[in-house]
Amino acid sequence: MAYRAAIREEGAEERYPALAVPTGASGPNADVWRDESFNNDLAYRGVVGAIGPITCLDALLFAQQNARVPQLERPTEFLASVLRKGSDEREEIVVVFGAGAELFPPKTVYGFDIVDDYVAQGWSYWYVLHNHTRQSNGALGIPVPSTSDVQFVRGLAAKRGLKRVRVTNGFYSFDAGIDEMRALRAK
């Protein structure tokens, strides 16, 4: 994939990319960046969740978004809800993929009505995958939930029974159970 090749060529394939904090942030904006740094520190030290190589399914979903909107040219975010249902004979998964063409798509594209239908049929809301492709300075995205993401997934857990959270930059993914997320700060 061109995205991965370009990142590798730049030498930017880092498991723990530095958070690009804007200089001169003050007031509430400075508080947000302080909380973002706090969360990244917990994740990078392994206190909350784990960061490892992207999984096969997550790479496929990231590639789907990259095929829709080239992530090097125009970074965009997506959210994929992964549900599962198992029996003694087999385990099944369903993916509800929501994205737009803009950097921050509206939550209306995330397909939560479909997720709700599956949950009502006995499927478990196994995990949500979200992406952070590139930072504003062009560096590889942070594979850690932002303070806004933390607040959002807490709501999904409370309302829909979400079990886990993953955040990927196309190379590495953060993975944590909802209970672990209590230590992270939210916006």
Please give the residue ranges for each predicted region.
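Glycine-rich short-loop/terminal segments
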Residues: 1-121
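Active-site-proximal loop/helix of nucleotide/amide-processing enzymes and allied scaffolds
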Residues: 1-31, 109-187
